[in-house]
Amino acid sequence: MCGIFGIIFAERPRRPLGEILRRGLERLEYRGYDSAGVAVVDRGLVVKKDAGKVAEVAQRYGFDSLQGVVGLAHTRWATHGKPDQVNAHPHVDCRGVIAVVHNGIIEKYAELKEELMKRGHVFRSETDTEVIAHLVEEYKKQGLDTFSAFKKALSRVRGAYAIALIDAENPRAIYFARNLSPLIIGVGEGFNIVASDIPTVLDHTKRVIAVRDGEYGYITAGEVYIEADGVPQDVAARIEEIPWSAEMATKGGYPHFMLKEIYEQPESLASTAAGLEPAQIETVANALLAARNVYIVGAGTSYHAGLTLAFILPRLRITPIPVISSEYAIYEDLYDKDDLAIAISQSGETIDTIKAVKAMRERGVKVVAVTNVVGSTLSRESDVVLYTRAGPEIGVAATKTFTTQVLTLAAVYLTALRALGHDVAEHQRELKAVPDLARKTIEKTAGTAKELAKRLRQRHSAYYLGRGAALPVAMEGALKLKEVAYLHAEAYPAGESKHGPIALVEEGFPVIFVFSDPNTGEKTLSNVAEMKARGALTIGTVPARSDYAKKLDVAIEVPQTSELFAPILHVIPLQMLAYFTAVERGYDPDKPRNLAKTVTVE
């Protein structure tokens, strides 16, 4: 939520600095925002900001004409103060020489604000962020240099934050700090960058340093300096080369990132399968079999991916405990050194998941991370990391990261199954075939999903039903429809639909069934009949050449595979259905309202 991009050059870049900042803002749009702004130093501090889309604000205030060698850009998601010109970032001090941008929430900021106002500081906004600019100003008044004043200000601040600050009186540095909110440094030649995440820096560099919780420092055009508790850190050893290209973070000819990322799934699955490290997978599988309790932790789509594993683990005589990240405290008294947690997060920065993992580790729980981002907070807080290799996912609604997470978890399950003496050769062959099956699924189902979207366009609600291992797929399908098409959708176990939900079913009410679990298909057909009898429009994802199709009004056939990999194939037409329904209803699926790609506040 919110986004930061700051860059400093040794000399004036060939393109105007404001244009570079504007392009950085465009890279941040996928994170979700309601306001945008920039600050540059050019014979003094210049700040331009307002509520609205990046393109609109940039044109209104002439971002592309701004010159200089150091600047900050920010997309804001309102938490304190309404989204308007005054509350948009950057914020400045009383004299208009310090500009600050901030992601997160400053706790008890009102007390600091009151203290500063008593000392004569004048506040312009309702935000918590503005406090930081005035604190630094106050300590500079006391004779401290900018960095010392910044550090002293940080000692007064509590909460989750990523901060970047520039000072027109010392314009050769960008100061930064991080606590529980993602922040990276992009390392260049003759320039350096501070940013919220990796896709934002790919136009400039692939070399990054992940700033850790509790760290602060500054960048100049030729130096990266980081401290923690007053101790300088070895930054050279922490530089990582990111295997993503700038082109991977563009639409590549598709109308939307979401559609592009749906179509990228065969490649992402192949990359993830090829990148599975047998030794690591075996370590996780053995830990799974040895654990007293197994917690599967995630939020949103990542939670649904975790459920695909949770629903089959009982076959290994393991009773999993699925944990929605924000509800981790429910099981706090149970956490023990003999337990295992599998924590899943696309970004590796989801605040609820990070907090859950930290609470578990404090009690000795071994943590396995499944994430898409190298060097993320989750990867550093975990004992073992399994990386999905989906490439950058820009669309707010997760698609390819869900299927690569499912594939990774299925590989762990297979290895545990083999450790128990089972023959998994056929499953291994299926794993290798999944990328090609995903490609065939996209080719065969896109047209049906597009036509079906026209029928859903005028509907107000829908049910997604599945039994057994099909339920997580139904849950993910319903979430996608809500996220991008703004069409109310609920997922239930198909058998549970009789206990209340069926009361809402009337003529034409869409009910989408998922037939990905071969053990429950026949029972699910009885629910199809119940819904049809009440006038529902029955839709289903079904294995090719099965008899299920005959019982449905609309059948979307996907290639046959085992229930272990079926969630990957059955979710693809549901992703496309959500996408095309959003387009039919006139919404931009890449920028769903009220949503952010990475949720970094509680």
UniProtKB/Swiss-Prot annotation:
Positions in coiled-coil regions: none
Gene that specifies this protein: glmS
Pfam families linked: GATase_6 (PF13522), SIS (PF01380)
Keyword set includes Cell membrane: no
Subunit structure: Homodimer.
UniProt GO molecular function: carbohydrate derivative binding; glutamine-fructose-6-phosphate transaminase (isomerizing) activity
Main location: cytoplasm
Lineage: Archaea, Thermoproteota, Thermoprotei, Thermoproteales, Thermoproteaceae
PROSITE patterns reported in the protein's UniProt record: GATASE_TYPE_2, SIS
UniProt xrefs under InterPro entries: GATase_2_dom, GFAT, GFAT_N, GlmS/AgaS_SIS, GlmS/FrlB_SIS, Ntn_hydrolases_N, SIS_dom, SIS_dom_sf
Record localization: Cytoplasm
Record EC number: 2.6.1.16
Alphabetical keyword list: Aminotransferase, Cytoplasm, Glutamine amidotransferase, Repeat, Transferase
Name of this chain's protein: Glutamine--fructose-6-phosphate aminotransferase [isomerizing]
Enzyme class: transferase
Keyword Metal-binding: no
Catalysed reactions listed for this entry: D-fructose 6-phosphate + L-glutamine = D-glucosamine 6-phosphate + L-glutamate
Active site: C2, K597
Transmembrane feature ranges: none
PANTHER family documented for this protein: GLUCOSAMINE--FRUCTOSE-6-PHOSPHATE AMINOTRANSFERASE, ISOMERIZING, GLUTAMINE--FRUCTOSE-6-PHOSPHATE TRANSAMINASE (ISOMERIZING)
Domain of life of the native organism: Archaea
CDD domains tied to this protein: GFAT, SIS_GlmS_GlmD_1, SIS_GlmS_GlmD_2
Gene Ontology terms describing biological process: carbohydrate metabolic process; fructose 6-phosphate metabolic process; protein N-linked glycosylation; UDP-N-acetylglucosamine metabolic process
Start and end residues of each SIS domain: 284-422, 452-592
One Gene Ontology cellular component: cytoplasm
